Amino acid sequence: MKKICVVTGTRAEYGLLRPLLYRIKEDAESELHLVVTGMHLSPEFGLTYREIEQDGFTEYERNEMLLSSDTKNGTAKSAGVGMVGFSDIYARIRPDMVVILGDRYEIFAAAAAAMLHTIPIAHIHGGEVTRGAVDEAIRHAITKMSTLHFTATERYRQRVIQMGEQPDHVHCVGALGIENIRTQQLFDRETMEESIGFSLDRPFVLVTFHPA
């Protein structure tokens, strides 16, 4: 049986990972080891580990790493604390693989510790571009530390290969969030209009906001 360690640090990436977590948990040949860290354990961000427990994942490792600071120094220190915690967890669990998604510094810490433990890393959503943001440097650094790569598009797959990764280790599988779309129970038009208090027959503009 293979020990698969999956790391989650925020609600955003947990929502994408959830279908995969269920698959691993149900697989007779795999043993899921979930590591919950970062914002999930912070009162400032709503203690969202409780949502993970409500989904049935009640047994997991906790890695307390988030300092109450939004400075660059605080972020760097949080990453350092996180790396120490991940190293201790990996030493105890001895996973066969670490699965990570995205480009946050919590995930960078998880990847760096796994690499130094020579644990294979499976990285989801590599090869993407976020120009002008630190996310891009973190994402590409994680790519270079990883063994297996699961990209959302063929363009991203080619970018990972251009970075020197072996083509047979880079797989274009689509966006993981599609699994949620396939299973999501959608509102009908009438319910949607009622929930937002607005008729979709009227002209409208949809704006999304992604804070830096």
Model-predicted regions and their roles:
Residues M1, K25-D27, E61, N73-G80, ...:
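PLP-dependent amino-acid enzyme catalytic core
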Residues L32-T75:
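Conserved nucleotide-sugar phosphate-binding/catalytic loop shared by glycosyltransferases and other
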Residues V7, L41-P43, S146-P211:
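A nucleotide-sugar donor-handling region in carbohydrate enzymes
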